[in-house]
Amino acid sequence: MSRQSTVEKKIEKFDPIYHNRLVNMVVNRILKHGKKSLAYRIFYQSLKKIQQKTEKNPLIVLRQAIQKLTPKLIVKSRRVSGSTYQVPIEIKKKEGKILAIRWLLESSRKRSGRNMHFKLSYEIMDAAREKGNAIRKKEEIHKMAESNKAFAHYH
């Protein structure tokens, strides 16, 4: 039996304006070089832009986008007797949400446009409508998991 104590799970904090954990998760992944106030400004401006364009609550649109981007399966490489297989693995909800946020931010950074809050707001709106590069990334991952279904027993 191990003598080490169990590690307590880290609880995500709430953001100052919306008091929402999801917002804080997104802001922490926008963050670069420790400039958190800039990350908050970018995100809040993109939420304002979403509200102007859709005339809906931006948090609901964000939640829809993240929900539609969250993958159920991912593929991981497994080495079995000299050959490498892409094995489909089910992932936890939180891990899927983190992946969805990462894909959303990557695709919004690649998007052409004036500045980050424009690109992020349009990517969130596209993801909520099941369009955009982030959705394409999710579908690609699911397709790869489906095609490698035969190797699922290696997990």
From Swiss-Prot:
Cellular component, GO annotation: chloroplast; small ribosomal subunit
Pfam families: Ribosomal_S7 (PF00177)
Keyword tags: Chloroplast, Plastid, Ribonucleoprotein, Ribosomal protein, RNA-binding, rRNA-binding
Single Gene Ontology BP annotation: translation
UniProt superkingdom: Eukaryota
Keyword flag Membrane: no
SUPFAM superfamilies in alphabetical order: Ribosomal protein S7
Molecular function as annotated in GO: rRNA binding; structural constituent of ribosome
Signal peptide: none
Keyword Ribonucleoprotein: yes
Subcellular location: Plastid, Chloroplast
Entry function: One of the primary rRNA binding proteins, it binds directly to 16S rRNA where it nucleates assembly of the head domain of the 30S subunit.
Assembly behavior: Part of the 30S ribosomal subunit.
PANTHER family: RIBOSOMAL PROTEIN S7
HAMAP family for the chain: Ribosomal_uS7_B
Annotated protein name in UniProt: Small ribosomal subunit protein uS7c
This protein's encoding gene: rps7
